[in-house]
């Protein structure tokens, strides 16, 4: 009898194997996706991530309230549903109902309290997160970033209800803030257990669709497998994602050999968005820079094409302060919809220099004697930007006769000097932490603590205030457009370049989602023949 049963079992297994082979299916086959990215992954802590590669990994090993679709709209993720209510004082309350079937990778339930903890931790000055201003629209933010984190208006009435109060209307809150890597939930127990909780397979706890497997000490290769306990695991595309981190030259050579290359790809690469822009700050408190004509002249003679090439091959000359990849409230690309505010055409450079010289004369600087009244003009910059600084110095002296001294410092000193207003001219990079034009325009309001240029422009403040309170998406887009134009014309904040993200995706690979700011999600990828 036992022999008969064994024979029957073997026969059944053989039949199943033949049947699966006939259908072209192998139960041992994994749906694999191979991805090469430039950059590094030093952390998987949502509050600490700063590179495109880090944000991409976090999008897979954690899950936020919402997740972006390929068309840029937001789909429900940890949140089953949400409601929105506007109070008489203009504040807006979002109430999210969370999934009850979501689990952390240690098997415990993901709750609303995890979001409260994560968001307050994000803005806590002790966390020292580079992404804290991602929550600047939440009521109580200004008190929270000074240390009173409980002032941040995010609460959990029960385990599966999350309430967030915003200071005012924020059209991008759902589609950008609630999908961001920085605002992912984190488990307080995991964070408290070990200082390197996000970098160790022993201590890491995530709630995402994928989990990191393999050798965690290998910083050049990350292997992600679907997490069996994920609530929507059956709808995932790849079973396994192999993410290789390479330098630019190696990544370029990988195009066509792997499914997706991000941050490289050679001449055939498409150009995606990157959240970083390079700017020249003119300190409004510096008396020598008081003439708007002088500031405009400094801006006009800058050869931005050369400056961008000097910074790196993944840079383009700035056409405004808001870079490509940032969307309007209506879903268009802000830069494309509003056009270029800065002329970078090489054929008109000579004409622009003549215009700059005319502006200088209007400001009263007609000869070497009058120019000497400027006294010492110093350009402060991070030492890594020395070539760009020298280029600007040469342009200002050769085209305008203005001599500028250069002062290169370490990045930590640059930050301190900017915060204290100890500069006349300074080079800096600004990185937006959410996909909206206000991420680049808000910092230059008179009351904003990030207003290093100490710009006090009443008309600009009014435009930004009206935009923030506008209930019309069309009107808000128009106000932001006008505010950017005014900012560029005033020339205290002078855009120089914006970074871009090249990428190559095989034709048969569909469903990769970019947030327009460098991070990607591959959980919905499928292959088509």
Q: Where are the regions that the model predicts?
A:
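N-terminal lobe/hinge region of extracytoplasmic solute-binding protein
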Residues: 36-87, 205
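Aromatic- and charge-enriched surface segment that lines or borders ligand/interaction sites
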Residues: 81-134, 163, 288-290
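Surface-exposed binding/hinge segments that line
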Residues: 97, 130-189
């Amino acid at each position: 009898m036992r022999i008969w049963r064994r024979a029957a079992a073997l026969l059944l297994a053989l039949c199943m194997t033949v049947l699966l082979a006939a259908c072209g299916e192998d139960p041992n086959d994994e749906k694999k996706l191979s991805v090469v990215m430039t950059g590094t992954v030093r952390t998987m802590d949502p509050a600490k991530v700063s590179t495109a590669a880090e944000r991409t990994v976090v999008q897979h090993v954690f899950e936020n309230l919402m997740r972006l679709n390929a068309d840029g709209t937001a789909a429900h993720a940890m949140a089953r549903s949400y409601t929105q209510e506007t109070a008489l004082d203009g504040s807006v309350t979002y109430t999210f109902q969370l999934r009850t079937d979501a689990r952390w990778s240690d098997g415990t339930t993901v709750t609303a309290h995890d979001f409260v903890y994560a968001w307050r931790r994000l803005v806590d000055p002790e966390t020292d997160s580079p992404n804290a201003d991602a929550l600047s629209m939440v009521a109580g933010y200004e008190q929270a970033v000074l240390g009173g984190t409980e002032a941040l208006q995010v609460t959990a009435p029960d385990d599966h209800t999350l309430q967030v109060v915003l200071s005012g209307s924020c059209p991008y809150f759902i589609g950008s803030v609630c999908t961001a890597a920085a605002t992912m939930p984190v488990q307080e127990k995991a964070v408290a257990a070990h200082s390197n909780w996000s970098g160790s397979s022993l201590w890491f706890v995530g709630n995402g669709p994928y989990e990191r497997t393999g050798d965690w000490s290998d910083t050049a290769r990350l292997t992600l497998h679907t997490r069996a306990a994920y609530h929507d695991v059956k709808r995932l595309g790849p079973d396994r994602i192999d993410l290789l981190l390479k330098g630019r030259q190696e990544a370029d050579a990988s195009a066509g050999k792997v499914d997706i290359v991000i941050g490289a790809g050679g001449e055939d690469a498409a150009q995606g968005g990157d959240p970083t822009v390079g700017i020249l700050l003119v300190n409004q408190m510096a008396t020598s820079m008081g003439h708007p004509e002088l500031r405009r002249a400094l801006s006009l003679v800058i050869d931005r094409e050369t400056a961008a090439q000097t910074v790196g091959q993944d840079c383009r000359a700035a056409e405004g302060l808001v870079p490509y990849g940032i969307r309007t409230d209506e879903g268009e690309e802000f830069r494309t919809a509003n056009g270029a505010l800065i002329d970078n055409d090489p054929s008109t450079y000579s004409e622009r220099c003549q215009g700059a010289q005319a502006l200088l004369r209007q400001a009263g600087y007609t000869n070497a004697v009058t120019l000497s009244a400027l006294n010492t003009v110093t350009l402060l910059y991070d030492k890594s930007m020395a070539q760009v600084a020298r280029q600007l110095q040469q342009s200002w002296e050769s085209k305008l006769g203005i001599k500028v001294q250069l002062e290169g410092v370490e990045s930590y000193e640059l930050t301190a000097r900017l915060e204290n207003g100890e500069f006349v001219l300074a080079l800096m990079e600004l990185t937006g932490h959410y996909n909206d034009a206000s991420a680049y325009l808000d910092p230059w309001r008179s009351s904003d603590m990030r207003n290093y240029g100490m710009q006090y422009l009443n008309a600009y403040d009014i435009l930004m205030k009206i935009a923030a309170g506008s209930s019309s998406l069309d009107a808000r887009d128009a106000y932001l457009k006008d505010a950017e134009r005014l900012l560029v014309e005033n020339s205290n904040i002078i855009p120089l370049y914006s970074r871009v993200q090249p990428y190559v995706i095989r034709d048969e690979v569909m469903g990769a989602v970019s947030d327009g700011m460098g991070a990607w999600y591959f959980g919905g990828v499928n292959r088509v023949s």
